[in-house]
């Protein structure tokens, strides 16, 4: 679920922690509670009822998602989601085949992304009026910039590294960004050994609607879900090339 992480913000947080605390900082008010999403329309409620019923049956485990063509590409994000992508579904036309599925660290399906490409060639996209995706209010739609994601695995240990990416412009300078390759990643300097790359794909510029599949007291379109408890490792080790 790509609404989120920023290594720049993390770096800034580290810098701020190193600075002397201002007077009264100890009395600072706690962070505000997560915001609830606006109530769904009748059409949205019908859409939510369908995906909350059907998606857990179609993709009950991460392995079932993989068998259906989804590929894991992230670590657990700060909301507790590990994302799997189906690159054939960037233009989502079937609610049963989301562009992305999210699982928690225990392997439970918790959410999905439904999307539409903003451009045809991964160049910086214009921002016209946001579309309604599968009947969802356009106001719920977010925009995400183009970048190239990849996964590497150590052949000796079997350990894989997720959440790695390079900017689309950087990759386009050395090759076809619509069809990135392991060799292309070597040329960008993102990896040293092409053989270590187990997955590489363009994450195009998209309009996107993230939706919780598990019940959410804040609403299925809310950014966070109190019913999903992230692990202590959530939100760490992700690139943000955008």
What are these regions (language model features)?
Residues 1-9:
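Bacterial N-terminal signal peptides that target proteins for export
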Residues 23-28:
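Boundary at the C-terminal end of the N-terminal hydrophobic targeting segment
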Residues 19-21, 209:
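Hydrophobic alpha-helix-in-membranes signature
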Residues 30-242:
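Primary mode marks residue(s) on the alpha4-beta5-alpha5 output face of response regulator receiver
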Residues 10-19:
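Bacterial N-terminal signal peptides
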């Amino acid at each position: 679920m790509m609404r989120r992480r920023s290594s720049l913000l993390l770096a800034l947080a580290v810098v701020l922690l190193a600075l002397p605390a201002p007077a009264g900082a100890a009395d600072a008010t706690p962070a505000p509670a997560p915001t609830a999403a606006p109530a769904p329309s009748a059409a949205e409620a019908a859409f939510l009822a369908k995906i909350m019923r059907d998606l857990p049956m179609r993709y009950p485990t991460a392995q079932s998602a993989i068998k259906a063509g989804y590929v894991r590409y992230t670590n657990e994000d700060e909301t507790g989601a590990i994302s799997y992508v189906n690159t054939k579904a960037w233009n989502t036309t079937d609610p049963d085949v989301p562009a992305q599925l999210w699982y928690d660290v225990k392997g439970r399906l918790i959410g999905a992304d439904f999307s539409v490409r903003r451009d045809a060639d991964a160049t910086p996209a214009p921002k016209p009026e946001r579309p309604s995706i599968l009947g969802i209010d356009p106001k719920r739609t977010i925009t995400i910039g183009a970048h190239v994601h990849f996964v590497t695995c150590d052949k000796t240990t079997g350990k894989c590294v997720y959440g790695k990416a390079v900017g689309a412009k950087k990759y386009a300078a050395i090759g076809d960004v619509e069809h990135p390759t392991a060799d292309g990643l070597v040329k960008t300097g993102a990896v040293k050994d092409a053989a270590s790359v187990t997955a590489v794909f363009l994450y195009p510029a998209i309009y996107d609607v993230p939706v919780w599949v598990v019940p959410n007291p804040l609403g299925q379109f809310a950014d966070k879900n109190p019913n999903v408890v992230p692990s202590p490792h959530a939100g760490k080790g992700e690139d943000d090339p955008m």
